[in-house]
């Protein structure tokens, strides 16, 4: 049972990441939503429009979210959305997910949490990015094979 004041983190199952638990806890405490991101990973260059992106204002405040569309000419340098999101309160996730469905804001005929994050940013909630130390994607068979042995 999900309580409205519960902290809620939602993520995909086709990746792994290294991150600082203390850093993410601090960001969750200071924001309504944290979008988990990575940068400078060659995986993005294969199909840049397969990802979502976040434009930030220093140091880590999200000011724009794009789903399945690049935001610059060099997407590898941008905050790329991992597919993990931490909501300080579950009620924020529930409210903005319901709004997304009510507005029928689909991308490629599907609803995405990237779009929930975009609604949160446009509603002036405090949204931050959490740039992970390392991202390991295994969303495609090639990615899985290439990342079976993870090098530190």
Language model features with spans:
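Conserved beta-loop-beta/alpha segment of the NTase-like Rossmann-fold superfamily
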Residues: 1-53
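Catalytic-core segments of class I nucleotidyltransferases/pyrophosphorylases
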Residues: 25-26, 58-136, 142-145, 149-151
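A short acidic, often aromatic-flanked loop/helix-cap motif at beta-alpha or helix-coil junctions
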Residues: 41-43, 135-138
